[in-house]
Amino acid sequence: MKLKITLTKSLIACRFNQIKTAHCLGLKKINNQVIKDDTPAIHGMIKTISHLVVVEKVSYTKEQK
C-alpha cells in the first residue's frame, strides 16, 4: 500500500524541524504531491506535519506512472 501526501498549507512560520521534515518527504511548495511507501518512518514524519498535509491511501502500480 502507498500513501499520497499533499502539502496543503505554507511552510512559512513553521518550526525548523517541520520544514526539514516536509523537505525530506519531497514537499517544497503548496499543492506538491508525493507517493511514499506506508512505513512507520513515514507515519512519524506525517505526524510531525499533520496540520500541513492531507494523506490518502492509494494502490499504486507501475502502469499508473
From Swiss-Prot:
InterPro entries: Ribo_uL30_ferredoxin-like_sf (IPR036919), Ribosomal_uL30_bac-type (IPR005996), Ribosomal_uL30_ferredoxin-like (IPR016082). GO terms for molecular function: structural constituent of ribosome. It comes from the Bacteria. GO terms for cellular component: cytosolic large ribosomal subunit. GO terms for biological process: translation. Keywords: Ribonucleoprotein, Ribosomal protein. Pfam families: Ribosomal_L30 (PF00327). Belongs to the universal ribosomal protein uL30 family. Part of the 50S ribosomal subunit. This is Large ribosomal subunit protein uL30. It comes from Aster yellows witches'-broom phytoplasma (strain AYWB).
